[in-house]
Amino acid sequence: MTKKDVRILAFESSCDETSTAVIKNGREIESLIVATQIKSHQRFGGVVPEVASRHHIEVITQITKEALDKANATWDDIDAIAVTYGPGLVGALLIGVSAAKAASMATGIPLIGVDHIMGHIMAAQLKDEIEYPALALQVSGGHTEIVLMKDPIHFEIVGDTRDDAAGEAYDKIGRVLGVNYPAGKTIDEWAHKGKDTFHFPRAMMEDDDYDFSFSGLKSAFINTCHHADQIHEELDKYDLAASFQASVVDVLSHKTIRAIKEYKPKTFILGGGVAANHGLRDRLAEEIEKLPADIKPKVILPDLKLCGDNAAMIGAAAYNLYQAGKFSDVNLNADPSLELPYADSMLK
């Protein structure tokens, strides 16, 4: 390893994945370990915070060693320790933060706290170089946001969900359809086999802002299914999935394209767990391709394995903070309600 190389050991434990990674120079994954808990939560239909925290405690020491071993690294090779400190489940976050702080204090290696949403967006940096200014559509179980990035560390929200996040809506309608948690992948697969025959609402699509709302769509879907149950009518699950997904994708793509036209970013990024949705990926790529050459941004769609929660994205984001000298200290604590700053236009 030459002096110009920077290696960061990263921790991620904001929800139901315990992950560690070693990232070199913010772009290269030397190791990535993800201990998933999905099977433990499936029978509950969603994440149980106490169960998640216990699983994090059980594996975090082991996967820290695995990440270092897989990267052929020792603590002497690590330049910084990064950790997600919010947003997320407070108990889950505390496990990662405590482990990272303990490692930092024991080794003297600098600590960097990372916003989980910034991490999701910076997963793109692990695939290709981001040219700034950039615009991201961040879509996950807890967040649906359009984020403007002036540079690698200054982010601001220009559009947000007013109620349910898109990923949350997927999981809730998945329960109605009897799909195991997490439901997103199955709904996406079913949608490709069906047609948009139910024409569910496209909330706020024509509003002159970049905000979203999915509670009305969720209610319309549930009411349609309940009404069919009452009159003993059997609905086609593939058409239901296709109709639901068409509504979500229409709204997300429409508002994203409008934001691209207004802000004229050099790069567009899709981030978050729902970034693995093939319907959304295909539509955005298709709509951006139609834009005039002078405003058509470079498009970075993260690798599917990096759409979910993982420590590699946290290491990528931490590298940018490292270069800017943005370090944390031993007072770093979990912040389950952490938010990126809102653009001035959102505060009026």
Swiss-Prot record:
GO MF annotations in UniProt: iron ion binding; N(6)-L-threonylcarbamoyladenine synthase activity
Catalytically driven reaction(s): L-threonylcarbamoyladenylate + adenosine(37) in tRNA = N(6)-L-threonylcarbamoyladenosine(37) in tRNA + AMP + H(+)
Cofactor: Fe(2+)
Stated family: Belongs to the KAE1 / TsaD family.
Superkingdom of this protein's organism: Bacteria
Primary localisation category: cytoplasm
Gene Ontology CC, one term: cytoplasm
UniProt xrefs under SUPFAM superfamilies: Actin-like ATPase domain (SSF53067)
Protein name: tRNA N6-adenosine threonylcarbamoyltransferase
Function: Required for the formation of a threonylcarbamoyl group on adenosine at position 37 (t(6)A37) in tRNAs that read codons beginning with adenine. Is involved in the transfer of the threonylcarbamoyl moiety of threonylcarbamoyl-AMP (TC-AMP) to the N6 group of A37, together with TsaE and TsaB. TsaD likely plays a direct catalytic role in this reaction.
Enzyme Commission (EC) number: 2.3.1.234
Pfam family, one: TsaD
Organism this protein belongs to: Lactobacillus johnsonii (strain CNCM I-12250 / La1 / NCC 533)
Residues given in the record as Fe cation binding sites: H116, H120, D309
GO BP annotations listed: tRNA threonylcarbamoyladenosine modification
Binding sites annotated in the UniProt record for substrate: Q138, V139, S140, G141, G142, D171, G184, D188, N277
Keywords: Acyltransferase, Cytoplasm, Iron, Metal-binding, Transferase, tRNA processing
InterPro entries: ATPase_NBD, Gcp-like_dom, KAE1/TsaD, TsaD
Entry note: cofactor: Binds 1 Fe(2+) ion per subunit.
Gene this chain is encoded by: tsaD
Location of this chain's protein in the cell: Cytoplasm
